[in-house]
């Protein structure tokens, strides 16, 4: 992170602070119109995000072919957007059928194409496939994928078309062929489409009294076990929830350790402190995405003597209900006896702690009240605003793809 980026984010945070003092919400920032972000085209055979299509970090697993006679056919909706040209080789209208998520992304992309190249429209060459023309388990069979070009079929535009598709919110974009761009989305009910940076509601936090309570029951005024900048255990004020979604199903990483045994559920985009060596001081453990933790690495856990390294035995995924992301004064927290960050989405713990400083000031001064669980649903407005500001300053690759899905859907 270069210093100017930090300064810009701090300035953005200061703007949010002044807006919050005036109206308890992000509002509209008045000032000069921002310069458009410079976009870089995708290269031939490049895909984004840089993971396989049918994985958690992209469009998710194949869920089965949809036919006109199947129950799931009702999940498909026709797209009659006049700004999109559908090739419709089959003359059945099949290419117009797609899931709502795919339709929303495609309509957004159509606007971007017209803005990028006046007089040019988006063209769909393949949408839902009912005839079996694609490879086995293709997302075309579920209406979750489209192959696209520009209406003028200028192949020099296709790299930028792919980039525009990424920006439009497609969950996976592939410069698959010199003749088209392939785009796909998550299923409508996929838990993978609902992953911010959180813990399940039954995960336990440790109070200053020694009592352990579910994170869902945290409230302002409580002090919870955390880690300070020196890597020592401390008790930190709970301020608010950065995410509070008690009823939604989410996908969690399940990290298990040995010597001592611990088990932690957290979403893939959340930060956790990791080292490759047992002898690394606690203060030098690095904050990384939970999705990048591997067996054999070490994470920090709490026991009677303090915070110690524990070797990761296994990492897998599991769905669970409820998602809570507590914010503390120190930006860290001990959940289920494992040290974790309060932050997610960007793999920069120190930067996150800095840009959340204005929000902590608001709570400490009593200008805004701490969040009671019943008062907030979903992602905190400050987190959403910081995310959108960060997208103007940081490179897209610095964001976890699943966090982007959560904040842009």
Curated annotation (Swiss-Prot):
Zn(2+) binds at residues 140, 147, 182. Induction: By activin. The record marks 267 as: Involved in auto-cleavage. Keywords: Autocatalytic cleavage, Calcium, Cell membrane, Developmental protein, Endoplasmic reticulum, Golgi apparatus, Hydrolase, Lipoprotein, Membrane, Metal-binding, Palmitate, Protease, Secreted, Signal, Transferase, Zinc. Belongs to the hedgehog family. InterPro entries: Hedgehog (IPR001657), Hedgehog_Hint (IPR001767), Hedgehog_sig/DD-Pept_Zn-bd_sf (IPR009045), Hedgehog_Signaling (IPR050387), Hedgehog_signalling_dom (IPR000320), Hint_dom_C (IPR003586), Hint_dom_N (IPR003587), Hint_dom_sf (IPR036844). Ca(2+) 2 binds at residues 90, 126, 129, 131. GO terms for cellular component: endoplasmic reticulum membrane; extracellular space; Golgi membrane; plasma membrane. GO terms for molecular function: calcium ion binding; cholesterol-protein transferase activity; patched binding; peptidase activity; very-low-density lipoprotein particle binding. Signal involved in the early induction and patterning of anterodorsal ectoderm, nervous system and somites. Induces ectopic cement gland formation in embryos. It is involved in the regulation of endochondral skeleton formation, and the development of retinal pigment epithelium (RPE), photoreceptors and periocular tissues. The record marks 243 as: Involved in cholesterol transfer. A lipid is attached at residue 197 (Cholesterol glycine ester). It is an enzyme of class 3 (hydrolase). Residues 1-23 form the signal peptide. SUPFAM superfamilies: Hedgehog/DD-peptidase (SSF55166), Hedgehog/intein (Hint) domain (SSF51294). It comes from the Eukaryota. One of its GO terms (biological process) is cell-cell signaling. Expressed in the marginal zone at early gastrulation. At stage 14, expression begins in the neural plate with expression becoming more prominent in the anterodorsal area at neural tube closure. At this stage, also expressed diffusely in the somitic and pre-somitic mesoderm. By the early tadpole (stages 28-30), expression is widespread throughout anterior structures with highest levels in the otic vesicle, the eye, and the branchial arches. This is Indian hedgehog protein. Its EC number is 3.1.-.-.
